Amino acid sequence: MSNNQTLIAQCEEKARQWLSPAFDEETRSAVEAMINNDDKADLIESFYKDLEFGTGGLRGIMGAGSNRMNIYTVGMATQGFANYLKINFKDKEQISVVVCHDCRNNSRLFAETVANIFSANGIKVYLFDDLRPTPECSFAIRHLKAQAGVNITASHNPREYNGYKAYWDDGAQVLAPHDKGIIDEVNKVKVDDVKFEGNKALIQIIGEDVDKVYLEQVKTISIDPQVIKNQHDLKIVYTPLHGAGRVMIPRALASWGFDNVHCVKEQMVKDGNFPTVDRPNPEIAEALTLGLRDAKALDADILMASDPDADRVGMACKNSDGEWVLINGNQTCLIFLWYIITNRQAVGKMKPTDFIVKTIVTTEVIRKIAEKQHVEMRDCYTGFKWIAREIALSEGKQQYIGGGEESYGFLAEDFVRDKDAVSACALLAEICAYAKDHGKTLYDILMDIYMEYGYSHEFTINVERPGKSGADEIQQMMKNFRSNPPKELGGSVIDVYKDFQSLEITKADGSKEKMDMPDTSNVLQWFCTDGTKVSVRPSGTEPKIKFYLEIKDTMNSASDFPACEQRAAVKIEAIKKSLGL
């Protein structure tokens, strides 16, 4: 029997378990069709493994099968989570959780399934009445003093996906030791163990009551309300890309005093099929096509777009030639943290112990700003749970004033412990108002930062490798980079190697030192003598390996920018060649 035939036989055996009466008729017929189909590709992809409850929860394609998002995989995850909560909070009279969801197909169904299972286990559930932004889920956990939370979302993944994010009592995604503890409990659960029959008496619907308190808190992060009064009619175009931002972001902007906000009509419609975009990802130009159409027609000052669960924000503005350009995640993070630092200092809100946080793959220019302004900057792993961890570690001792990552996630407050597109959109609008009040544009602010702290060009290469064979290939690539690391990148000599799996820093002369990080992570970083930085990591949520490139240069005036961009583009191609990409 060949390896492929063995795999098919194993998948068929597993699939037949899904034909039992424990599963509904629709699921059974979908599984039967896979078994009977001569092409076994669907069968293999749906059953070759169990959808893994990872450190962030679940993420996968919706459909029948053990490797798919459905009420059964969601149900087993929730039962395991409930079991862990009952062990961990055994002395608490009434455990409570918050359940939230985005606009995706089946999101409400999955959220109600989660609520039913928690309540059937004697756990009180605060269930949002409709879709809400991810940051509001985090806020609600803290505000309602719940022990945990679940958010049904797949962020900006394609429409076929859905996901399940697990939160702890501080409103952050679960970290050690609870992540491993929950995973262990989830892995013990079989479908027959799941208590699907809900207890309505333990489910409380929440909505506007939490919305109001959240919006009031978001208002408190404004640094310079006067510039908003001066520029209240700033022309803002906003799109939620059919997602949860539609509920809160226009309200947040209005509450800050912006009274000239235009929402992209076609994309204000809640729709998990995302009919107006190929991918609902504010990082990509195609998703902003309609937003740019409206921004040009209205001669707007800024365009902002949030992803389906409204935790990330993409932005566009006019350059010095009056052309609309996308501002990438690193650039937005630069503008965001530069404004927070310099303007908190200007209005006397800064304390010597205040700190900011960025992720290891985010631009090093932020380090330069922090050093020059004498502000503590911390580096952490990719993923906002690590930024939340830094906030928690310093609670009551030092004040977190802002953080962000290159993947379009930003947080300016500590009453939320996940990235927040609601507060970020409001603060970015304030920054735009500040620029206009000083006779500048957002683009001018970016150029000013490059001139003062150094030009930087960041470029991410995503190498997609779907399915089981893809996962194996990605593993092999990382193995090869470790055993045979490059010596140069596009002509730039590497002088520092960081391996976050072994937590070792290796210098070009062979000397080694240990890194102080809270955990290991499958990430490699190479630093060159000319400031070039390359980071390599497999994605935690998608079947791809990511290469983060950062190229440095000097910019004496805004007119130097095109030449810097050209040199960076040449350098990127040379680095790709060095890496065999």
Residue ranges with predicted function:
Residues 110-118, 161-168, 311-331, 366:
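Short Gly/Thr/Asp-enriched flexible loops that form oxyanion-binding sites at enzyme active sites
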Residues 167-195, 330-354, 358-368, 421:
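Glycine-rich phosphate-binding loop plus the immediately following alpha-helix
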Residues 5-114, 204-236, 244:
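An N-terminal, well-structured beta->alpha segment
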Residues 98-161, 259-314:
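N-terminal small/polar loop signature for handling phosphorylated ligands or for N-terminal nucleophile
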Residues 18, 22, 26, 42-46, ...:
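Gly/Ser/Thr-enriched, mixed-charge loops and adjacent short helices
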Residues 296, 300-302, 323-325, 343-537, ...:
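Phosphate-binding and adjacent anionic-ligand microenvironments
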Residues 47-67, 154-157, 236, 240-252, ...:
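Conserved phosphate/anionic-ligand binding catalytic regions in large, soluble enzymes, centered on
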